[in-house]
Amino acid sequence: GKYDNGRGSARLSVFNFSHEIKSGRTSSVAHHILGFDSEGKIVNNDLMKMDWTDIVKASSKIISFFDLAGHEKYLKTTIMGLSSSIPDICFITIGANMGITKMTKEHIFLCVMLNIPFCLIVTKIDITKDRKNVIDETLSEIKILLKMPGIRRVAYKINNSEDVLLCSKNNNTNSIIPMFFCSNVTGEGIDHVKQFLNL
């Protein structure tokens, strides 16, 4: 894939409508696929433009992604996307600079209510590098939220490949929630997400 420029350039390939590009917010359900070959390498990336037929032919494993809206205004669209696609897992993104928001809680509760396993991806760690307390505070908020009645999950911060393997093995229990800390600008942590997807 390609890294972001820090101003949202990478997400332009995900948006369906011009108003999404202007606002920077997903308002619809976008569907994309990612292919892995037999060696675990990603088949389709931004350097090679491939259509879905070519991706499927070249892949030994296909992952379907449904990008859903995160904004409160489009919650009904998100609920429809989650309940109709019946995903194997849901990735909930949290901006390290924003922390837990009302919608983060809503999305976690939706996954719990629909019995969908989920992971948390804390993004934008590049802009909080010099403020370790911000990331620590976000991590603390996540742990508190996941311990709430009705959720009762354990957050597990992914630090290395062994952590990825451990969380992948225990993912079907729904009790351990993997947390990936990533930067879409520097690429830090992205390899752990790719490894998790390919297991």
Could you describe each region identified by the protein language model?
Residues 2, 37, 81-85, 110, ...:
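Conserved, well-folded catalytic cores of nucleic-acid-processing
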Residues 60-64, 68-76, 84-108, 112-136:
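Conserved Switch II/interswitch segment of TRAFAC-class P-loop GTPases
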Residues 53-55, 81, 109-110, 170:
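Beta-strand elements of modular eukaryotic interaction domains
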Residues 18-20, 51, 77, 164-168, ...:
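Eukaryotic intrinsically disordered and solvent-exposed regulatory patches
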Residues 127-199:
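Canonical P-loop GTPase G-domain recognition
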Residues 1-73, 85:
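P-loop NTPase switch module centered on the Walker A-proximal segment
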Residues 23, 122, 182:
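Single, functionally critical "micro-switch" positions that shape active/binding sites
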Residues 30, 119-122, 155:
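Short beta-strand segments at enzyme active-site cores
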